[in-house]
C-alpha cells in the first residue's frame, strides 16, 4: 500500500523559499499552472489544502452508505435553488466556472507515477481519470488565456472559484500524502452536482432542457458512470490500509468528500451574490487603483499626494488603496466643485502625461466616482471586483534535515527522484543531472542535418528503423546467450523497466502551455505505458510478473530497499535517474524530452528486440514485455509514429511563433535529447559487458 502516514514536510531552506508566495486561491492557481517555474510554492499549496480540509463542515460529509448507494448522484447538503436576473444566461455561467472546468479532474494527473506504477489503487484511479477526461463539456476559453496572470486576478471572477480550482491543482501534487482525501474528493465530484449544474438550475425556463441534454447531462453521466468503480477502490483501500495497520481512513475520505461539497457551495453562493447584488463605483475604482499601482512605481519621482511621494504610495505592499483614495479626493488634483476641470482628469487627456493609461470605460468610472464626491455610490453596469481570500500561514509541522543531493550517486538519488512528492527540493539536483548528460551528448554527437524539414525527419526515422531491422534472421537453436545470463540481465534492467514511461509522467503539465496538443500526444503514449489503468497491460506490472516467474523478488520501486538491492549494478540506475529527473524538470527541457521519447520508442523495434523475443521463448522465459513493445512502438501507427508527430507539431509551433532560425535551434535540442539516451546508458552497457565477461554464466 503506497500511502504516507507522516505529515508532509520539507527542508527548512525550501520552506523559507515558500514565503515568497501568497497563500490565496488566485495566486496559487496561477503558480500551480506554472509549477515548473514555481516549485517553492508547494508548501503553500499543501497548507492551503490542509486549511480548507480543517474548515470543511461535517454536514457535507457523506454517510457510510454512500459507498453502497445505487443512485450515482447524491446531494448530502441541500442548498436553496439560486435565482438570477434576466441578464444572466448559460454563457455567463460557463465564464464564471471556467477555471473549474479546466482543472477537473486535474487532481488525478499524477496519480500514477514511477512510485505508484504498480499500485492497483493508483491504477484504478488512473483508469477513472481516463474516463473523466473524456467529458464533452469544456470552457470556451483558451488554455493560454487561463494561464495568464491577468486571468486569475481579474475582478470579474469571484475568488471562491479560484479557491476550488487551486485545490484541484494542489491535490495533484500530493497523490501519496493525501490519497484518502483524493479518493473522497473524487467520489464527491462523481456523485454530487457540479457548480455549473447548480448554476444552470437557477436559469429556470431561460435555458431549455433540450439544450441541457447534450451538455450537462452527458457530462454528468460520465461522472456518475465512475461511481461504482470508485466505491470498489475505496473499499479495497480501506481493507489494505487496515491490514497494513494504518487505522481508520474513512474520516479522511469524508473530509475530502466534504471539501468538494463545501467549496462548490461557496462558489455558487459567491456567484449568486455577485449577480444578485451589484457593486459600487467605489469598489470598482479601488480595484482599478490596485491594478495600476504595481506598474506605476518609478514614474512619479517628484509628485506628492497627502504629503507623501506617489512612488512611496505605489511601493507599499499591500497597496493601501483606501487611504490613497481618501488622500486623492482631498488633494488639489480633484476639483469637487467642477469635476470636469479637475487636474487629475487632464492627466489622462490627449498629450497628457498619462494618456492611454485608462480606457474610455475606466475614465467614465473615474468621473462617476468623483461626481459622487469620492464616496460610496450606486453602481452602473460595469466590471465587478471581489476581495481575494487568503489562508493563515501556519508554521511548518516538521522540517527535515537538509540533504545534499549533489553528492549522491545515481543509486542513492533514485529513491529521492521517485519520491519527489516528499522531497521537492530534489528538483534542483534533477535539473543539474539532466544538464550534464545533455551537455555530454551534444559534445559526443553531431546533428544529422542543421536545417529542419519534416521530410528530413521522416527520412532520419526511416533510416534508423531500416538499419535496426535489416539483418534479422529466423531463430535457429540454440540461443546465443545462456538462460542464466538472461535471468541476470532481466534483474539488472528492473530499475529501468519498472520505471517504464517515467520520462512522460509530467506531460500533463503541458495542458496549460501553448504546446497542449503536443502534451496530448505524449499523454497518449504515457497512458499506454501505464496500461491505461489495466493491471494486465501495465508495463511495470508485466515486468514484475516476469521477475516473479524467474523467482526474482525485488522490493517495491518507491522504497529505499529497492535502490539498496545488492544484486543491482550501480550503473543500473543511470538511465532511470536520467529519465525520472527529466520528467521533473517541467517544460524547461521539452525539445530534449521529445528527442529522448523518439529514441526510446525507436529502440523498442528492430532485429535486436525480435532476436531477444525468440531467445527468451527458446528458454521458456515470458517475453510479454518485449512483445508489447514491438507491437505498440511500431513506426506506422504506434508510439514511434506519435513521437514523430509530437516533434513535427512542436517544431511547427516554434516556427510559427519564433521563426525558422529558432526552430532549427530547437531541432538541435531535439536531437541532443535523442542522443542523450545512449549517453545516459553508456556506463551501464559497458558494465553489463564487463560483468558478463567476468561471470561467464
Residue ranges and their predicted role:
Residues 1-60, 383-446:
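Extreme N-terminal leader/anchor segments
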Residues 129-133, 212-231, 338-350, 625-645:
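Histidine-centered, metal-coordinating catalytic motifs and their short helical/loop contexts
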Residues 275-405:
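Aromatic- and Gly/Pro-enriched helix-to-coil junctions and flexible linker segments
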Residues 33-80, 287-322, 328-329, 412, ...:
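Compositionally biased, flexible interaction segments
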Residues 356-357, 624-626:
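Intrinsically disordered, low-complexity regions enriched in proline, serine, glycine
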Residues 55-221, 251-290, 448-625, 675-682, ...:
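Active-site-proximal alpha-helical scaffolds that flank and shape metal-associated catalytic sites
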Amino acid at each position: 500500500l503506497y500511502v504516507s502516514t507522516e505529515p508532509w514536510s520539507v527542508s527548512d531552506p525550501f520552506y523559507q523559499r515558500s514565503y515568497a508566495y501568497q497563500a490565496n486561491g488566485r495566486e496559487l492557481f496561477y503558480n500551480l499552472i506554472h509549477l515548473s517555474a514555481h516549485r517553492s510554492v508547494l508548501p503553500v499549496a499543501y497548507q492551503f489544502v490542509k486549511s480548507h480540509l480543517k474548515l470543511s463542515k461535517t454536514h457535507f460529509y457523506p454517510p457510510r452508505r454512500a459507498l453502497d448507494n445505487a443512485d450515482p448522484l447524491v446531494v448530502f447538503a441541500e442548498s436553496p435553488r439560486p435565482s438570477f436576473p434576466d441578464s444572466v444566461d448559460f454563457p455567463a455561467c460557463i465564464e464564471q466556472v471556467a477555471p473549474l472546468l479546466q482543472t477537473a479532474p486535474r487532481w488525478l494527473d499524477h496519480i500514477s507515477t514511477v512510485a505508484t506504477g504498480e499500485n492497483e489503487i493508483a491504477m484504478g484511479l488512473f483508469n477513472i481519470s481516463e474516463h473523466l477526461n473524456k467529458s464533452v463539456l469544456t470552457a470556451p476559453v483558451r488554455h493560454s488565456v487561463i494561464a495568464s496572470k491577468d486571468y486569475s486576478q481579474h475582478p470579474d471572477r469571484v475568488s471562491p472559484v479560484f479557491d476550488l480550482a487551486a485545490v484541484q491543482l494542489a491535490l495533484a501534487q500530493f497523490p501519496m500524502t493525501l490519497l484518502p482525501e483524493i479518493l473522497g474528493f473524487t467520489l464527491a465530484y462523481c456523485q454530487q452536482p457540479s457548480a455549473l449544474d447548480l448554476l444552470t438550475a437557477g436559469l429556470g425556463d431561460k435555458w431549455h432542457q433540450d439544450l441541457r441534454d447534450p451538455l450537462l447531462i452527458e457530462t454528468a453521466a460520465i461522472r456518475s458512470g465512475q461511481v461504482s468503480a470508485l466505491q470498489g477502490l475505496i473499499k479495497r483501500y480501506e481493507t489494505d490500509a487496515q491490514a497494513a495497520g494504518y487505522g481508520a481512513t474513512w474520516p479522511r475520505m469524508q473530509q475530502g468528500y466534504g471539501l468538494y461539497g463545501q467549496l462548490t457551495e461557496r462558489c455558487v453562493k459567491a456567484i449568486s451574490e455577485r449577480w444578485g447584488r451589484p457593486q459600487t463605483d467605489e469598489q470598482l475604482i479601488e480595484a482599478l487603483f490596485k491594478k495600476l499601482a504595481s506598474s506605476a512605481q518609478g514614474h512619479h519621482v517628484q509628485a506628492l499626494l497627502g504629503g507623501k511621494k506617489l512612488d512611496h504610495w505605489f511601493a507599499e505592499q499591500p497597496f493601501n488603496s483606501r487611504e490613497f483614495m481618501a488622500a486623492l479626493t482631498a488633494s488639489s488634483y480633484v476639483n469637487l466643485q467642477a469635476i470636469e476641470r479637475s487636474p487629475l482628469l487632464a492627466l489622462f487627456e490627449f498629450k497628457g502625461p498619462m494618456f492611454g493609461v485608462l480606457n474610455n470605460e475606466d475614465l467614465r468610472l473615474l468621473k462617476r466616482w468623483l461626481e459622487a464626491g469620492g464616496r460610496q455610490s450606486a453602481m452602473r453596469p460595469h466590471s465587478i471586483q471581489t476581495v481575494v481570500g487568503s489562508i493563515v500561514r501556519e508554521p511548518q509541522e516538521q522540517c527535515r534535515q537538509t540533504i545534499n543531493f549533489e553528492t549522491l550517486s545515481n543509486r542513492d538519488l533514485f529513491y529521492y527522484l521517485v519520491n519527489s512528492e516528499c522531497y521537492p527540493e530534489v528538483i534542483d539536483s534533477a535539473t543539474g543531472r539532466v544538464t550534464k548528460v545533455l551537455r555530454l551528448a551534444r559534445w559526443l554527437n553531431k546533428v544529422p542535418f542543421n536545417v529542419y524539414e519534416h521530410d528530413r525527419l521522416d527520412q532520419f526515422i526511416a533510416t534508423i528503423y531500416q538499419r535496426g531491422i535489416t539483418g534479422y534472421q529466423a531463430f535457429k537453436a540454440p540461443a546465443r546467450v545462456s538462460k542464466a545470463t538472461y535471468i541476470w540481465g532481466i534483474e539488472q534492467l528492473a530499475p529501468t523497466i519498472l520505471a517504464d514511461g517515467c520520462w512522460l509522467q509530467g506531460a500533463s503539465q503541458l495542458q496549460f502551455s501553448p504546446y497542449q496538443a503536443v502534451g496530448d500526444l505524449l499523454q497518449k503514449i504515457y497512458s499506454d505505458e501505464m496500461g491505461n489503468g489495466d493491471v494486465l497491460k501495465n508495463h511495470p506490472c508485466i515486468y514484475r510478473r516476469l521477475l516473479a516467474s524467474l523467482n526474482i523478488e525485488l522490493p517495491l520501486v518507491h522504497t529505499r530497499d529497492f535502490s539498496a538491492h545488492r544484486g543491482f549494478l550501480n550503473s543500473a540506475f543511470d538511465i532511470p535517474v536520467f529519465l525520472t529527473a527529466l520528467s521533473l524538470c517541467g517544460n524547461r527541457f521539452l525539445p530534449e524530452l521529445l528527442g529522448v521519447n523518439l529514441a526510446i520508442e525507436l529502440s523498442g523495434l528492430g532485429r535486436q528486440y525480435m532476436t531477444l523475443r525468440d531467445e527468451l521463448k527458446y528458454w521458456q522465459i515470458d517475453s510479454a514485455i518485449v512483445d508489447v513493445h514491438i507491437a505498440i512502438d511500431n513506426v506506422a501507427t504506434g508510439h514511434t509514429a506519435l513521437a514523430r508527430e509530437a516533434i513535427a507539431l512542436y517544431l511547427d509551433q516554434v516556427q510559427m511563433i519564433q521563426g525558422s532560425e529558432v526552430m532549427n535551434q530547437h531541432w538541435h535540442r531535439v536531437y541532443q535529447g535523442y542522443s542523450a539516451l545512449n549517453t545516459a546508458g553508456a556506463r551501464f552497457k559497458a558494465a553489463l559487458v564487463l560483468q558478463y565477461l567476468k561471470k561467464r554464466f
